[in-house]
Regions:
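Short beta-strand micro-motifs within the conserved protein kinase catalytic domain, predominantly
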Residues: 112-120
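Activation segment signature within eukaryotic-like protein kinase domains
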Residues: 154-155
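Catalytic-loop of the protein kinase fold
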Residues: 166-182
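Regulatory alphaC helix of protein kinase catalytic domains
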Residues: 95, 99-100
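A conserved loop-to-beta-strand element in the N-lobe of protein kinase catalytic cores
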Residues: 119-127, 135-136
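Protein kinase glycine-rich loop
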Residues: 53-64
Length: 364
């Protein structure tokens, strides 16, 4: 269950147009008390070089602004500082985790970490993607759907990013379209927001604090008596469940459990084993991935490396063909045009048919 801690020391928009390095201690006097933070000095940026512009997003744990770091346009996430010493300690711990995890994983489908500062505000600086969130993009597109090869391409981007996190022992716990950002040309997707991420170990028991119900795995909240702060066992397969919901959404462009409130969706998924309906026009291969991701038993869900392999196979068959070259010609490495003979074209056609037949047998 996510915990919203509001920054009571500042009014809406107060950070906009400000330089972080200026004196901006909070109303409760705790903003500068950061001696317990243990972040490598090489990860810190000079707050005097940060300038906060307009707000571009907001989550449970902070606000995100467009800004500038030196001469570079960046995204600046200002974390809530809490209104009590206890809140401050908890939020500092989350800040440390997020910075350390973002700094150690690098992938083309993960938002690039630039740096952080801890005084006078807890701030994380990342690359700024000029596109929009996947959530907003899908909403703007409705009632139309994504083209199939685009939807699968986005899903592959997400699965590759998650595979990288899991390979580094990190559970994201908040995988949803709001935390997925499009590049400027809308060609690919990058995963953002490590605010709820956790490092995974075999013996660790993690808190029930989690992301948004509609995308959450049932094992995160299925114990009725579980109170905030209590411990509960789960593993990285909670991200696989969330991915299954996101993949369904990419293919249908519908809100999961759209007829239900958040709590109704949680109850239906956890106690009635309900899942969003899979339309008939979704291929059996994609339906299989979705259903295997959100199966009740976490141990039966696939790994992201398996999901990546399956999606790659499907994408190969649905990707749009490149425009034909004039007169069945192909460009050679030295830039000259070489024409394919009729027998050569027939040979390539035969190879494509052979591959399709082999794949069909494997699926049976």
């Amino acid at each position: 269950m996510s915990c919203t801690v509001k920054n009571k020391g500042r009014e809406e928009g107060e950070y906009e147009g400000s330089v972080i390095g200026q004196n901006s201690s909070s109303q409760n006097g705790l903003i500068a008390s950061s001696s317990d933070l243990s972040i490598d000095e090489s990860l810190l940026v000079d707050p005097k070089m940060l300038f906060i512009g307009s707000k571009i997003g907001e989550g449970a744990h902070g606000k995100v602004y467009e800004g500038r770091y030196g001469d570079r346009i960046v995204a600046i996430k200002v974390l809530h500082c809490g209104s009590t010493p206890e809140e401050r300690i908890a939020l500092e711990s989350r800040f440390i985790r997020e910075v350390n995890m973002m700094s150690r994983v690098k992938h083309e489908n993960l938002v690039k970490f630039i740096g952080a500062c801890k005084d006078p505000l807890m701030v994380i600086v990342t690359e700024l993607l000029p596109g929009m969130s996947l959530r907003r993009y899908l909403v703007n597109l409705r009632p139309k759907q994504l083209e199939l090869h685009v939807a699968i391409g986005y899903a592959l981007d997400i699965a590759q990013a998650m595979d990288c996190l899991h390979a580094n022992g990190i559970i994201h716990r908040d995988l949803k379209p709001d935390n997925l950002l499009l590049t400027a040309n809308h060609k690919s997707v990058k995963l953002a927001d490590f605010g709820l991420a956790r490092e995974e170990s075999v013996t660790e028991m993690m808190t029930a604090e989690t992301g948004t119900y509609r995308w959450m795995a049932p094992e995160l909240y299925s114990t009725v008596t579980l109170r905030q702060g209590e411990k509960k066992h789960y593993n990285n397969k909670v991200d696989v469940y969330s991915f299954g919901i996101v993949l369904w959404e990419l293919l249908t462009n519908r809100m999961p459990f759209d007829k239900m409130s958040n709590l109704q969706a949680a109850y239906a998924a956890a106690f009635k084993q309900e899942r969003p309906p899979i339309p008939d026009d979704i291929s059996p291969e994609l339906a299989f991935i979705i259903q295997s991701c959100w199966v009740e038993d976490p141990n039966l869900r696939p790994s992201f490396s398996q999901i990546v392999r399956l999606l790659n196979e499907i994408l190969f068959t649905v990707a749009p063909s490149p425009p034909p070259l004039p007169e069945s010609a192909a460009t050679t490495s030295n830039g000259t045009i070489a024409k394919f003979s009729v027998p050569a074209r027939g040979k390539f056609s035969f190879i494509r048919q052979l591959f399709a037949a082999k794949r069909s047998r494997n699926l049976q």
